[in-house]
Design a protein with these regions (language model features):
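Short helix- or helix-capping micro-motifs
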Residues: 91-93, 184, 192-201
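C-terminal long alpha-helix characteristic of the crotonase
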Residues: 158-163, 214-262, 269, 291-294
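Conserved CoA-thioester-binding segment of acyl-CoA-metabolizing enzymes
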Residues: 1-21, 25-27, 31-84, 126
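Well-ordered beta-strand positions
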Residues: 156, 195, 199-201, 207, ...
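Glycine- (often His-adjacent) and acidic-residue-rich active-site loop
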Residues: 83-123, 143
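Glycine-rich beta-to-alpha active-site loop
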Residues: 120-172
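Terminal low-complexity tails and localization/encapsulation signals of metabolic enzymes
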Residues: 1-9, 280-294
Length: 294
């Protein structure tokens, strides 16, 4: 597989030459039964400064990635989602783009524009849930809002000690809109969800590990190496059994259609308020990353 590169993200095949998978029921179609197989996975790298904000360009590329991954089940065993941006994994939705959309779209059409975006990102993250491949988020630094929601759509989160997690959307008069709350509810108790949502406070990697949000914590800068170790271990297992176990443990649809519609409806309703427009205006006027930090 040749690497694919866009301005906002890229993906490539990673093969561990030191690991032989042998042969057997997991042998990919077209592979010779006598040829030792190597542990292989796909790495999706986010690289949009300042902190991988998810706007139209990133969403377009994510949709391309999901379409691509659907044809790679024969050889891939896992997907690692990572960031090359020093500030962190992902700061969430591109609020500047949202602000521009609200400025240039007629008031009565704003909800429809936002709704289309949300429905598309929901489909992308639902594909992560439904994929037979194990998905691993390797996170560091800022993992806020929509970035937190992307990580929650993965089967495992591996974080380094610099990682911080938060849902700061209520500070803007909004709610998380990428399905993160239902996904969080399947991992932790209701009181934890309410605390993170209603206070907007951030938690560090150690606290996330205690709560069960994170599976492992690495030294600063080592999350990707640890995630690769996990992918290497998963790649040694029978792929059919891995997919079956994932489907059994993790619901394919953490959001019912009713929940998804209710979340999107509420987000769009809140988006129409003057208070949200004012909050976005204030955010855009800042040239600092400080608004990301609760």
């Amino acid at each position: 597989m040749m690497p694919r590169h866009t301005e906002v993200l890229s993906w490539s095949r990673v093969e561990d030459p030191s690991t032989s998978l042998g042969t057997g029921p997991s042998t990919p179609l077209g592979a010779s039964p006598s040829t030792p197989l190597r542990a292989s996975w796909i790495e999706l790298e986010l690289h949009r400064p300042p902190c991988n904000e998810i706007g139209s360009a990133t969403l377009d590329a994510l949709e391309q990635f999901v379409e691509y991954v659907g044809g790679q089940h024969a050889w891939a065993r896992a997907i690692i989602v990572r960031s090359s941006i020093p500030a962190g994994f992902c700061a969430g939705a591109d609020l500047r783009e949202l602000h521009e959309r609200m400025r240039h779209v007629a008031a009565g059409d704003r909800a429809a524009s936002v709704r289309t975006f949300l429905e598309r990102i929901h489909r992308v993250l639902a594909a992560f849930d439904a994929s037979p491949l194990a998905t691993i988020a390797a996170v560091h630094g800022v993992t806020f809002g929509g970035g937190f929601e992307v990580a929650l759509a993965c089967d495992l989160i591996v974080a380094d000690r610099t990682a911080r997690f938060a849902f700061p959307e209520l500070r803007l008069g909004l709610i998380p809109g990428f399905g993160g709350i239902p996904r969080l509810k399947r991992s932790v108790g209701q009181h934890v969800v309410q605390d993170l949502l209603l206070t907007g406070r951030s938690i560090n990697a150690s606290r996330a590990l205690e709560l069960g949000l994170v599976s492992q914590v690495a030294a600063p800068g080592e999350a990707l190496a640890l995630a690769r170790d996990v992918a290497r271990q998963i790649a040694k297992l029978d792929s059919t059994a891995v997919a079956a176990a994932k489907q059994f443990v993790k619901p394919r649809a953490p959001l019912s259609d009713e929940e998804r519609r209710a979340e999107i409806d509420l987000f769009c309703t809140l988006c129409e308020r003057p208070a949200v427009e004012a909050a976005l205006e204030k955010f855009v006027a800042s040239s600092s990353l400080q608004p990301y930090l609760p």
